[in-house]
Structures are given as structure tokens and as C-alpha cells.
Amino acid sequence: MTPNKAKRRLADNMRERRLSFNLTQTGLSERSGVALSTLRKFEQCGAISIDNLFKLMLVLGGLDEMIEASALKTSGFSSIDEVLSGKETPKRKRGSRS
């Protein structure tokens, strides 16, 4: 998925959420503190700052799920035998030099 397609899909999803709550753009703007012009632009072309997106998601829901989806998923050991056999070695937590 391209960034533009992702922005468009996110904007469509948020518009559907707004409508499912039976909120007008003006109503959502007032509840979230996001300017009406910003909300309109977001729903039309997907452009929005992360701060304003978070404000909208606080009102419409989904912020916790978005934060959880961005978390690093690590696979732990499933048994003591895996720990003792050393199948998984600790990963370095440093970035590489460019």
C-alpha cells in the first residue's frame, strides 16, 4: 500500500466512524478541538497532523488500538527448554550507522 492510499483509506475509515456516531463535521470539530477546515481537508484528501489525528481518535475511538498496532512484537520463549537450548539469542538494540 502506498502512503497516499493509506492516507485515503484512513480518512475514509475516520469518516465512517464519525457517521456511525451520527456526528456532523461541525460536531466532531467542536468535540475534538480540531478546526473544521482541518477536518474537511482530512476527509477530502487525507492530510492531517498526527496531533489532530490523535484528537479525532480520542473522540471517535481507536487510539489505543493504533498505539498497540505500532508496538514492537517480540517473540519470547515458549518453554524452559528453549531457554536452556539457547535457540533464541538476545538481539542488539542499537541502530546501525549509516
Report each predicted region and the residues it spans:
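Short amphipathic alpha-helical segments with heptad-repeat character
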Residues: R8-A11, R15, M57
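Short, charged recognition helix plus adjacent turn
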Residues: I67-S98
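Short basic helix-loop element that most often maps to the first helix and adjoining turn
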Residues: D12-G27, K87-S96
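A detector for short, charged/polar N-terminal pre-domain segments
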Residues: M1-R9
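Short, basic-rich loop-to-helix N-cap that marks the start of a DNA-contacting helix
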Residues: C45-L58
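Helix-turn-helix/winged-helix DNA-binding modules
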Residues: S20, R31, C45-I48
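Short alpha-helical DNA-recognition segment
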Residues: N22-R40
